């Protein structure tokens, strides 16, 4: 009998690691990402918990590497869960990389894992609350529809360059980030029917602010910014990575078998608090 395999991109990160620990209770884990040293550290933690795990160095922006990851995972057993958390933000890198990793990388992941996902499998792509901060324009939709075209990346790059403050690279990167995360929701929903033909599900999660090591740096280095951010969250606190692990595990379970083609906004009420007048 083949073992059950769960692939987690970005599994060495705060939320990714929590997801690995939760799903690792019933499945072997394949950690995928660019930083092999961090993945091996995460693997050591999983080993201590008795979780069977593997590491596969992968740049998700590289189609060939993602294809190799999918083939490797399939060689280990039945690929039942693919959790794609990898991504970059404006504070990490430039506009070009945001589009290449977040948008093109998601296309690569879906296209590579659709053929190997076993019957009854689930794929979850991670978007962000940032996807809800800007409306999807007709120009964005037209660019999104070109996801399979050779100039897809270039189209998104052009749209990011049309930011009002073109002199600010950070502003361009911020626009590219919101656009790339909105694309993740769009592309996830665009794949629902074909995944259903295999009796598989595909959905997305949009996290708000979670107390990951990266977010802790913001709190430590920019306390005023963090305080202002916290004031926007009706829950009055940051999310905890273990909560994301539990949510992801539920969405992968049979009990969530009718949850499909939807984005789960897990932001402590932040989006509603900002955009809907409160009582």
Regions found by a protein language model. Give the residues of each.
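Conserved glycine-rich cofactor-binding loop
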Residues: 12-13
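Conserved glycine-rich Rossmann-like NAD(P)H-binding loop of the short-chain dehydrogenase/reductase
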Residues: 27-41
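Rossmann-fold cofactor-recognition segment
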Residues: 46-64
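Conserved NAD(P)H cofactor-binding loop of Rossmann-fold oxidoreductase domains
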Residues: 83-90, 269
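Catalytic loop of short-chain dehydrogenase/reductase
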Residues: 90-92, 122-197, 209
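Short, small/polar-rich loop/turn modules that mediate ligand/substrate recognition or access, typified
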Residues: 201, 259-261
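A conserved structural motif in NAD(P)-dependent oxidoreductases
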Residues: 233-244
